[in-house]
Structure formats: C-alpha cells, structure tokens
C-alpha cells in the first residue's frame, strides 16, 4: 500500500455546508476564562453598536454576546468595524439622488411625466403666455410687493399702522413703503 492510497479516517472532518468559526489563541483563552464566570449566552442578537466620541460608531456584525447573571454587564465577541454615520448618510443621499435622477431620465425618455407636460425648453417657451397690458392686474399685495422693492407689504401690518395712528389705509401704506417696511418708523412718521 502506498502513501497516495492511504486514507485516514478523521473524526474531525467538517461536513459540507457547515460553518466553522476559527478563533485566535488569545480569544480562546479569553473565552475559557469567561466560562468560569458563569456567563449566559444571549441568543438572537445580530448587530451591536457602540457609540464613541464625535458620533463614531463601532459596529459588531453577527456577534456572540454573553451576559453576567448578577448585573447588566455584557461581553461581546466579534469583529468590530468603525462606521461613521455622517459619511454613511452622505453616501445614502448620493445613492438616492442618483436613483431619482435615473428615474427622471427614464420618465423623460418615455415622453415626460404627464400628458401635457412640455418635453423641452422650447415647448415650454412656446406654451408660456405672453405678457401684455390687456392681462388682468394682480391683486393688492402682489402689486404692493413689486412696487415697494424687496419687502412684502402685508395687510396685517397696514391695519396695525391704521389702528395705532388713526390715519386711513392709503396714508398708512404710503408711510410703510416710504420707510422700506419698517413698521415702527412708519408709525412714528404718522404721529
């Protein structure tokens, strides 16, 4: 019998499809020392997250967790990986942006989002109404806002000026606009 044909039956053969965890020597020593403490293994934990300073997370995926029976002290075995939630959120936002832009491109390629939505800038410009003087003028506040510059004239503030000074709305509006939206100066001007 030659050495090539020799087959040694070993009881430690691992069946196909089985998962085997190989532990380092220091980890085996730590496990053996912890067995003497009477720790109970906690089943069903799939992820352990430890928060460190500056929102840095230590994440242990598929850990082995043991609990001390006398206190709320847990011992976790597994490979810890550093995870930064800020960078993870940024990557997730980039992925969402890419997915939404891809969906928009696909919708645009299929003819737009809805019926009647312009497919190009030229179509949008052709559909835009022309601005001529026969169009009805916008109501009160919008006209005042465009005439008064970069601030908005609100009817509540005009009514407050009228109540404080006793003048009519036209004078209150004029004072408010001349004071560039400063409510107190408009009231002081009219008194």
UniProtKB/Swiss-Prot annotation:
It holds the Pfam family UBA_HYPK. It is found in: Cytoplasm; Nucleus. Residues 127-139 have a biased composition (Low complexity). One of its GO terms (biological process) is protein targeting to membrane. GO terms for cellular component: cytoplasm; nascent polypeptide-associated complex; nucleus. Residues 153-191 form the UBA domain. Residues 126-149 are annotated as: Disordered. Keywords: Cytoplasm, Nucleus, Protein transport, Transport. The keyword Cytoplasm applies. Residues 24-89 form the NAC-A/B domain. GO terms for molecular function: phosphatidic acid binding; phosphatidylinositol-3,5-bisphosphate binding; phosphatidylinositol-3-phosphate binding; phosphatidylinositol-4-phosphate binding; unfolded protein binding. Component of the nascent polypeptide-associated complex (NAC), a dynamic component of the ribosomal exit tunnel, protecting the emerging polypeptides from interaction with other cytoplasmic proteins to ensure appropriate nascent protein targeting. The NAC complex also promotes mitochondrial protein import by enhancing productive ribosome interactions with the outer mitochondrial membrane and blocks the inappropriate interaction of ribosomes translating non-secretory nascent polypeptides with translocation sites in the membrane of the endoplasmic reticulum. Belongs to the NAC-alpha family. Part of the nascent polypeptide-associated complex (NAC), consisting of EGD2 and EGD1. NAC associates with ribosomes via EGD1. This is Nascent polypeptide-associated complex subunit alpha. It comes from Cryptococcus neoformans var. neoformans serotype D (strain JEC21 / ATCC MYA-565). The lineage of its organism: Eukaryota, Fungi, Dikarya, Basidiomycota, Agaricomycotina. The gene is EGD2.
